Amino acid sequence: RPDQPIVGGDMGVKLRRPALSSYDTEAYLQDLKSIVFCIMIEKSIAVDHLDAILARARDRGVDMTQWGPADFSFSRAEPSLQHSEAIKPFEALVIQKSLEYGIQPRIELGSVEQAKRYIDLGVRHFCIGWDRFILRQQLMLLGSGMRKLTDLL
């Protein structure tokens, strides 16, 4: 957030990438105001103290929460939890509480088909895949298709 009395942020004018072509401080201020302020809920201790964290986040102007099932599972010394049905109550709690505090939750998906459950829980913001995984998946499909064709030669 911008370092201004009304906003309460701590980001001042700095020589960063936006300054490469020009240095319009008004445009830079607008860029800072447009940034989504997101916190991650990814540790067991964070879920244990979720109300306090979300109350403070709301007071600080946090826009979004990001649920982290992998790190949550690791922090409970249960790495396989992230792939089990037992993760769902924790995930639902984070989503429900985020919405109660007026903070939009964001969920990472591997496919569009996974979105329905989250939409039903009130989620409206998604990250679908990651570039390297999407590329790998498509390249594997292309490669296996070409292998089938060329194996017949």
Spans of model-derived segments:
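C-terminal helical cap(s) of enzyme catalytic domains, especially alpha/beta-barrels
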Residues: R1, D131-L153
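Alpha-helix-loop-beta-strand connector modules within alpha/beta enzyme cores
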Residues: R1-D3, Y28-S34, H83-R106, K148-L153
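Glycine-rich tight-turn/loop motif centered on a GG-T
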Residues: R1-G9, S75-P89, G129
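Conserved anion-binding
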Residues: R1-R60, P69-F72
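Hydrophobic faces of well-ordered beta-strands that scaffold small-molecule active sites
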Residues: F37-I41, T65-W67, P105-E108, H125-I128
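Non-membrane alpha-helical structural segments and their capping/turn regions in soluble enzymes
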Residues: V47, S84-A92, V112, R136
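Catalytic cores of alpha/beta
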Residues: V47-R58, I107-R124
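Alpha-helical scaffolding segments of alpha/beta enzyme cores, especially the outer helices
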Residues: A52-A55, P89-Q96, E113, R117, ...
